[in-house]
Every structure is written in structure tokens, then in C-alpha cells.
């Protein structure tokens, strides 16, 4: 009998081992599948899609460094440098000797202007792999960003000692020598860069730029033309060739090249600005004005754009608009004497003599401070000690990325930066194909998943931020399913149709239901908030009509009102009293606080939502927008990175705008 028991036990162990082995093998197969799929996405520049595959690979094997590293590469290409940094750091926690992770993390630090950390990473990488020429090139680039050009040259020398045919090393060394005011040596290196990689557009372009600085216009033009032969869609080459045309006096040819830049790169504010300046110099103010408007739309904090647009309005004798633009310039840079003087002149034209005189006196006080013999002129700018302030008010966006490249890089997409809406339970007849997602974000819970698996498949329920009217095709479906309480089905149907009062009545009947009460409360909070916003909009419309009927020339003081969200807030508080871990209720409460302009309570509510549902991408996104509004950009950018990682593509456009 003992022997029989031991045999049974042996067979049990064998069976258990085979089960465990099959699970391990399956996990490895799935991991490799998603790594391969992600690599294919990376190679085809589908960076956003690759992140999803690497996320899945990490779920199968959270201790394998490869998925983190590749996901970091994808985030880097989406300009999510903080997210990339986190993934490269995680890679090194798992594999402390992985040179490529040090290399890429160093480059990421460099992009974030963390030059000390970048040099530390390159140093560590070179300790592991001292004969890696690419590492020496990357280290040289960081030295250049620190204006340590001699050190940069030494790094490039080492790279060329390892690989004497490395075009990029010659290219970068040539640029470094140009900064060291060794133009002839710089040209020699740039000649070698072209020689060793004839089809390197960058080498032709940079050599042309150095020749341009040396006033060798004819040969510079030849290099730019050759660069365009290799890459006719490169906006930076057209931009540089336009400068060459200007230097040789061919303004019309320069204008054509600038126009080509904006055809390829529609958000290149620097080029719009240059075009506007050229039109202004030609006294074509009517053509300059719309270009300045594009600049202010892209870079609303650029002081020169407002200042020059003000001058353009003045030349067109639109003096009030001119004064308004000079005011914007003054708000951005209060010590801009020229803006005070110009506004003084504009106000004089508007017969505002007192305002004109006050502006003139302010300008004179600024000029006097600049000319104060006892002080340093720079002292006037001491209050703006943070250099990023000047970067913000003087810099113009100019990525020089053409339209085709923008299509694969979601950070360049045009998005309306607005928070995601509240979450409610909606029915949908959409049927995604296997492996595909619905065209909007959805979430599910155990009860909802069980219901979806048991119904007749005419529709499914999902928790979503998509507006209710999107689901009109499924509005009557719940009414036909006997397992759904009639009142809840009626509430959903009325919510989709926009009949708020009927929906509210129906949901109140269901709010204490043991199974459907939670979802009734969620939906009820959304409907109550929507009704409050509708009532506020109607009231504002009535006020606007009464205001337009007034004969007074004075502008009435209109109090900015907020919708009455109290009923919606009370429903959510009641739900949270009985189910404190309901992430979706916390999220909806966060939205109500945000709409009420209670920003810190909104952040707290979103944080609770994330605590109980770490994959709630919209909570990260909305919390990030709230933090941005409060000026907490670093915290916001971390949230945006997480939102993008979880699948919200809009996050990368916001990162591009606020996290660089």
C-alpha cells in the first residue's frame, strides 16, 4: 500500500511539474511574441503601438530587462523623456551591466539638460565598453552642450581612433571646431564626413551652414541643393537655403523656401515669424498680419510676436489692436521699454493722453535704470534669474519635422487640451475584432464582465468616458433584456437621448439596488452634472441677451458663475460612503471638483481613483492637466507619461508642449 501511495504521489508530482512547465513555456512564448511585435512597431516608427506590446510583455515577465529598455526607446521617440528615463533606470536595476541602457539614459539626461547625470552615465558605459565609438560621440555631444568644446573634440578623436570611417564623428568634430573658431579645420572634418557617407543629408547640411557663416555663399548653396537632392522633404535645409538667398539679396527665392518650410512643418513658428518680418520690411503689412497671428497662436507667450504684430496693426492704422498687442508684450515682459513707448504712441493716436503720458514715463524710468552709472545694466533683469523664463518669452517653436514624420509621432498631433469627461456605464453594439480595441477607452468590473458573458450579445456594457449620445445606436437595447431592471434600462435610454429629468427619476429608483445601484449612482452623478451645466448655459444665454439690449456704453461686470454640482457631489459622496474603493466614483468626483475650480480637492480625488485603479489612464491625464494649471509641471509630466503608457495618445502632444 505504501508503494502504491508513493507511485500515485510520483505521478501527481510529474503531472504538477508538466503543468508548471507548460505555464512557464507558454509565458516565454507569449513574452517573445509581444517583444517581437513591439520591435516590428519600433522599426516602422509606430512608437505608440509598440508601447502597448511592451506593456503586455512586461505583464508576462516583469523581471526581463528587454521590454523595459525597448519601451524606453519608444517613449524617447515620443519626446516622453521622463518616462524613457524611468524605463532605462528600471532596465539597469535588472541588468546593471547593460551598456545600451546607460548609453540611452545618458542621451535622455542630455535632452533633459541634466548634463552631470548624462556624463556620469556615459562614463559608466565607457568603463564597461571603452571601445564603443558611439558612446564617445554621445559623450562629446554632452560636452558641446556644456560649451566644453575641447573636451568634445577629444571624445570625437577617440571615436575616430576606434573607427576612422565614422562620418558622424567627423561631422560633430567639425561643428565643435567651428565653435573653437577653427573654421578651416572644421571644413576639413565636414569634407571627411561627406566623403565617408555621401548620402548623409546632415553632413551636407552642416557643411553648408558652416560655409554660410564663412560667407562662402555659392558653395553653401551647392551643399544645400545636394542635401535636397537626398531629402527633398527636409524643412531645415529649405530654412538654411532661405538664409543663403537672403544673404545674396534674393528675397523672393528666400520667401519661396520659407513657404516650403511651412508647407512641410505647419507649426514652425520661427519660419512664420521670419516670413512676417520680410513682408513687413517690404511694407506688405496686410500679408504680415496673418503670419504674426499664426505665431501668436503657436507661441502665445512669445513677446516679440505680440510686439511686432502690434507694430503691424499700427502701420495698418488699427490703433486699438496695436495698443492691445503692446499690452500683451508688457504683461509678458514688464521691462520691455520699447513696448511701453509704442503703446504710448498708440494711445496718443486714440486720444488717451493720460495713458500715453504714463506709458512714456514708465519707458523713461526703465531706460534710466539701464543707463544708471552706478549699476550694471544686467541688474534690471535680475528678477528674471531663471533662464527658462527668457526661453519661454523669446523662443519660437521650430522642430523642423516634416508632415510625413509627424504622422507617426503622436507628440506632433493637434489636440484640444481638455480633461476627459466623467465615467458612466453605457451599452455599445461595437464589436472589436479579436486583438483589436474599441475606438474609445473602456473599463469593466466583475459584475459587468459577468453580465456581458451571459447576455445575448446584442450589446455589451462598458464603463467609459465617452459621451452618452455616442451610444445612440444601442439606446433601446437594454430595454429588451429581461435580466436588466426596467428602471436602470430606462435611465440609460433616457440619458443617451439627453432627457435628463427622466433619466434622473429612473436612476433614483435604482440607487439602492444590490447589483445595479453602484452603476445607477455613477450614471446619476453624470446626468446631474450635465443638467447643472445645461442650466448654467441657459442662464448665461439669457444674461447675454439682456446685456445686448442695454444701451449703456460701459461694459457690464459679469460675475463668472460655476454650475451647481452639489446634487451630483452628494450622490458620489453617498456612493463612496458605502464603497470607498470605487475608483470610478473618485474619478467622477475629481471631475466635479475640477469643473468647480476646486483644484486641490480634484487632485486628491484623482489620486484616490489611481490608488484603487492604477490603470485608470484618464485619472492620470486629468490630474496632470490640473497640475499644469497650478504650475506643477514636473509632477504633471510624470502623470502624462503614465497616461501615455496606459494608452492615451493625447498625452504625448501635451508632453511635447509642456515637458520639454
Feature-to-residue mapping (PLM):
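Canonical tetratricopeptide repeat
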Residues: 36, 70, 104, 138, ...
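Structural marker of alpha-solenoid helical repeat scaffolds
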Residues: 60, 94, 128, 162, ...
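Position-specific recognition of the canonical hydrophobic site in helix A of tetratricopeptide repeat
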Residues: 35, 42, 69, 75-76, ...
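Structural signature of tandem alpha-helical TPR/SEL1-like repeats
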Residues: 44-53, 77-90, 112-124, 146-158, ...
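Alpha-helical adaptor scaffolds
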Residues: 304, 311, 526-530, 542-600, ...
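Helix-start (N-cap) detector for alpha-helical repeat units in TPR-like alpha-solenoids
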Residues: 30-32, 65-66, 99-100, 133-134, ...
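Eukaryotic alpha-helical solenoid repeat scaffolds
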Residues: 315, 337-502, 542-567
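Alpha-helical segment of the N-proximal tetratricopeptide repeat
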Residues: 29-60, 73, 77, 107, ...
Amino acid at each position: 500500500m505504501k508503494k502504491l501511495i508513493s507511485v500515485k504521489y510520483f505521478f501527481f508530482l510529474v503531472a504538477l511539474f508538466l503543468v508548471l512547465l507548460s505555464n512557464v513555456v507558454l509565458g516565454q512564448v507569449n513574452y517573445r511574441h509581444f517583444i517581437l511585435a513591439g520591435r516590428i512597431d519600433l522599426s516602422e516608427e509606430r512608437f505608440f503601438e509598440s508601447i502597448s506590446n511592451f506593456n503586455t510583455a512586461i505583464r508576462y515577465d516583469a523581471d526581463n530587462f528587454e521590454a523595459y529598455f525597448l519601451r524606453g526607446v519608444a517613449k524617447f521617440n515620443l519626446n516622453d523623456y521622463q518616462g524613457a528615463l524611468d524605463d532605462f533606470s528600471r532596465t539597469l536595476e535588472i541588468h546593471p551591466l547593460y551598456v545600451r541602457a546607460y548609453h540611452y539614459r545618458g542621451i535622455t539626461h542630455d535632452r533633459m539638460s541634466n548634463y552631470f547625470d548624462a556624463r556620469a552615465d556615459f562614463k559608466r558605459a565607457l568603463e564597461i565598453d571603452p571601445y564603443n565609438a558611439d558612446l564617445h560621440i554621445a559623450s562629446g555631444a554632452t560636452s558641446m552642450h556644456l560649451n566644453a568644446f575641447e573636451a568634445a573634440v577629444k571624445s570625437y578623436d577617440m571615436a575616430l581612433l576606434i573607427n576612422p570611417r565614422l562620418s558622424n564623428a567627423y561631422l560633430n568634430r567639425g561643428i565643435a571646431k567651428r565653435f573653437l573658431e577653427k573654421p578651416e579645420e572644421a571644413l576639413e572634418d565636414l569634407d571627411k564626413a561627406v566623403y565617408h557617407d555621401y548620402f548623409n543629408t546632415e553632413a551636407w547640411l552642416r557643411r553648408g551652414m558652416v560655409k554660410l557663416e564663412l560667407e562662402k555663399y555659392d558653395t553653401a548653396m551647392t551643399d544645400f541643393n545636394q542635401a535636397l537632392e537626398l531629402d527633398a522633404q527636409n524643412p531645415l535645409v529649405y530654412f538654411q537655403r532661405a538664409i543663403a538667398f537672403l544673404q545674396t539679396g534674393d528675397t523672393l527665392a528666400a520667401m519661396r523656401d520659407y513657404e516650403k518650410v511651412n508647407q512641410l512643418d505647419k507649426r514652425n513658428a520661427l519660419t512664420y515669424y521670419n516670413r512676417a518680418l520680410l513682408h513687413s520690411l517690404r511694407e506688405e503689412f496686410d500679408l504680415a498680419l496673418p503670419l504674426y497671428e499664426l505665431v501668436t497662436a503657436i507661441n502665445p507667450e512669445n513677446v516679440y510676436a505680440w510686439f511686432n504684430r502690434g507694430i503691424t496693426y499700427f502701420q495698418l492704422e488699427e490703433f486699438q489692436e496695436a495698443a492691445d498687442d503692446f499690452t500683451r508684450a508688457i504683461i509678458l515682459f514688464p521691462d520691455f521699454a520699447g513696448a511701453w513707448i509704442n503703446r504710448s504712441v498708440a494711445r496718443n493716436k486714440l486720444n488717451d493722453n493720460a495713458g500715453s503720458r504714463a506709458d512714456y514715463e514708465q519707458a523713461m524710468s526703465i531706460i534710466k535704470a539701464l543707463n544708471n552709472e552706478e549699476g550694471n545694466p544686467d541688474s534690471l533683469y535680475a528678477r528674471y534669474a531663471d533662464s527658462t523664463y527668457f526661453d519661454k518669452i523669446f523662443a519660437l517653436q521650430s522642430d523642423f519635422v516634416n508632415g510625413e514624420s509627424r504622422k507617426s509621432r503622436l507628440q506632433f498631433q493637434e489636440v484640444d487640451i481638455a480633461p476627459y469627461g466623467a465615467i458612466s456605464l453605457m451599452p455599445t453594439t461595437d464589436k472589436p475584432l479579436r486583438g483589436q480595441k474599441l475606438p474609445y477607452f473602456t473599463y469593466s468590473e466583475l459584475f459587468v464582465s459577468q453580465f456581458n458573458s451571459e447576455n445575448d450579445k446584442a450589446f455589451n456594457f462598458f464603463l467609459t468616458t465617452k459621451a452618452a449620445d455616442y451610444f445612440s445606436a444601442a439606446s433601446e437595447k437594454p430595454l429588451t433584456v429581461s435580466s436588466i431592471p426596467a428602471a436602470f434600462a430606462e435611465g440609460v435610454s433616457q440619458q443617451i437621448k439627453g432627457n435628463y429629468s427622466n433619466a434622473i427619476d429612473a436612476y433614483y429608483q435604482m440607487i439602492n439596488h444590490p447589483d445595479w445601484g453602484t452603476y445607477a449612482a455613477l450614471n446619476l452623478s453624470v446626468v446631474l452634472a450635465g443638467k447643472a451645466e445645461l442650466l448654467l448655459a441657459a442662464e448665461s444665454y439669457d444674461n447675454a441677451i439682456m446685456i445686448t439690449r442695454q444701451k449703456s456704453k460701459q461694459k457690464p461686470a459679469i460675475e463668472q458663475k460655476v454650475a451647481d454640482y452639489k446634487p451630483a457631489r452628494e450622490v458620489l459622496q453617498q456612493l463612496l460612503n458605502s464603497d470607498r474603493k470605487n475608483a470610478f466614483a473618485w474619478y467622477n468626483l475629481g471631475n466635479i471638483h475640477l469643473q468647480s475650480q476646486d483644484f486641490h480637492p480634484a487632485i486628491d480625488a484623482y489620486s484616490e481613483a489611481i490608488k484603487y485603479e492604477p490603470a485608470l489612464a484618464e485619472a492620470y491625464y486629468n490630474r496632470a492637466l490640473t497640475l499644469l494649471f497650478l504650475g506643477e509641471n514636473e509632477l504633471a509630466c510624470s502623470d502624462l507619461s503614465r497616461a501615455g503608457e496606459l494608452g492615451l495618445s493625447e498625452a504625448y502632444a501635451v508632453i511635447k508642449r509642456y515637458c520639454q
